[in-house]
């Protein structure tokens, strides 16, 4: 599990390789990832946008920006949490993702929170120790 905290908002990520949706022969690898966003602060906030940077094992970067997550722009009061699962394909057996969410407070202040960088590893990925 990966974890980041920004302004009392915790984001945890748990990636999961899906062999049944992957094919070594076709160089298609697929992961799901479950994200939990927990508001430990004192004010209500809303997730407005997402910005992902996805990097495969060859260093190829892909940036994705969009409204909300999984079609929602959740509002989180103090102590509330939002959980969702999404997925990502890669042409390589490993890679990583990182990102940010734009939030807005009850008072209208916009700010960004970090999504922790997380590793996408399949059983086919060659391990390299530095």
Cite the ranges covered by each PLM segment.
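Terminal connector regions
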Residues: 89-130
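Low-complexity, acidic Ser/Thr/Pro/Gly-rich terminal tails and inter-domain linkers that flank the onset
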Residues: 1-27
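Intrinsically disordered, low-complexity Pro/Gly/Ser/Thr-rich segments with frequent PxxP/GP/PP motifs
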Residues: 62-94
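Short glycine/serine/proline-enriched coil/turn segments at secondary-structure junctions
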Residues: 23, 43-44, 91-95
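Short acidic, flexible loop segments centered on an aromatic residue
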Residues: 43-62, 103
């Amino acid at each position: 599990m990966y974890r980041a905290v920004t302004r009392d908002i915790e984001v945890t990520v748990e990636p999961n390789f899906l062999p049944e949706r992957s094919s070594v022969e076709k160089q298609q690898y697929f992961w799901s990832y479950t994200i939990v966003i927990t508001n430990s602060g004192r004010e209500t906030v809303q997730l407005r946008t997402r910005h992902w940077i996805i990097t495969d094992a060859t260093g190829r970067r892909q940036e994705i920006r969009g409204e909300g997550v999984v079609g929602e722009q959740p509002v989180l009061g103090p102590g509330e949490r939002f959980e969702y699962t999404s997925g990502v394909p890669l042409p390589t057996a490993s890679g990583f993702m990182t990102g940010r969410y734009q939030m807005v407070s009850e008072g209208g202040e916009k700010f960004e929170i970090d999504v922790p960088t997380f590793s996408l590893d399949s059983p086919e990925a060659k391990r390299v120790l530095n």
